[in-house]
């Protein structure tokens, strides 16, 4: 007998954005519920696994922490492929990191799947007195691209879990819509040739 799959969905999610915006800290907070004041400069790419129970489904997230430095762009570009979700992070206290979001959107358009889910995240909201990026400005920017926006603090865990859960839910809903609306010429084929994926689903 074959064993039941450990999860219903498997999603690859990328964290991208300038160096120092807190991508690694967001990942550590979500995956391990930990925090470090030490600056983490990611060398290349690292990832963590986190399993969620969402809307009655078990979802396994593979979250990749990609370096933001320019010299790593050529290394990380290949990792855009196959990602179902991309979380674009900027630092609320660093105007340049927000200005560069537009360039990162260009990277996504160039390397990622056309229908990949995206989420704009303004991190470090705990530094209230140092905040320079206006929330409404960031929200308007996100709306112009048709993507959700949320502000977080990895240090005090504000909205961190919500950030990843909302991304997972958006991906799941998008894939559910795709599965439930097959093209007319695919219906007969699918009824005759059922997939042998063992219940696991991984889509771009």
Swiss-Prot record:
Q: Where is the composition biased (Basic residues)?
A: 192-204
**Which SUPFAM superfamilies does the UniProt record give?**
P-loop containing nucleoside triphosphate hydrolases
One GO location term (cellular component): endomembrane system
Q: Where is this region: Disordered?
A: 182-204
Q: Name one Pfam family in it.
A: Ras
Per the record, lipidation of type S-geranylgeranyl cysteine is found at: 204
Where the record places motif Effector region is: 39-47
What is the topology of this protein in the membrane according to its UniProt annotation?
Answer: Lipid-anchor
Swiss-Prot/TrEMBL keywords: Cell membrane, GTP-binding, Lipoprotein, Membrane, Nucleotide-binding, Prenylation
Q: Which InterPro entries match?
A: P-loop_NTPase, Rab, Small_GTP-bd, Small_GTPase
User: Which molecular function GO terms apply here?
Assistant: GTP binding; GTPase activity
Q: Where is the composition biased (Basic and acidic residues)?
A: 182-191
Of which family is this protein a member? Belongs to the small GTPase superfamily. Rab family.
Q: Which PANTHER family match?
A: RAS-RELATED PROTEIN RAB
Q: What is this protein called?
A: Ras-related protein Rab-1D
State the organism of origin: Dictyostelium discoideum (Social amoeba)
What gene is behind this protein? rab1D
């Amino acid at each position: 007998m074959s064993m039941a799959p450990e999860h219903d969905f498997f999603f690859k999610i990328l964290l991208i954005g300038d160096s120092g915006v807190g991508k690694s800290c967001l990942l550590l907070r979500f995956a391990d519920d930990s925090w470090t004041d030490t600056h983490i400069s990611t060398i290349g790419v690292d990832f963590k696994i986190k399993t969620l129970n969402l809307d009655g489904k078990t979802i396994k997230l593979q979250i990749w922490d990609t370096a933001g430095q320019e010299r790593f762009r050529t290394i990380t570009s290949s990792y855009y492929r196959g990602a179902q979700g991309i979380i674009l992070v900027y630092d609320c206290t660093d105007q340049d990191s927000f200005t560069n979001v537009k360039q990162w959107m260009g990277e996504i358009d160039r390397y990622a799947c056309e229908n990949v889910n995206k989420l704009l995240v303004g991190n470090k909201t705990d530094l209230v007195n140092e905040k320079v990026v206006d929330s409404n400005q960031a929200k308007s920017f996100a709306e112009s691209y048709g993507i959700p926006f949320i502000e977080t603090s990895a240090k005090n865990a504000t909205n961190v879990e919500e950030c990843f859960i909302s991304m997972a839910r958006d991906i799941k809903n998008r894939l559910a819509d795709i599965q439930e609306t097959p093209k007319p010429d695919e219906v007969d084929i699918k009824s005759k040739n059922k997939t042998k994926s063992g219940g696991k689903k991984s889509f771009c």
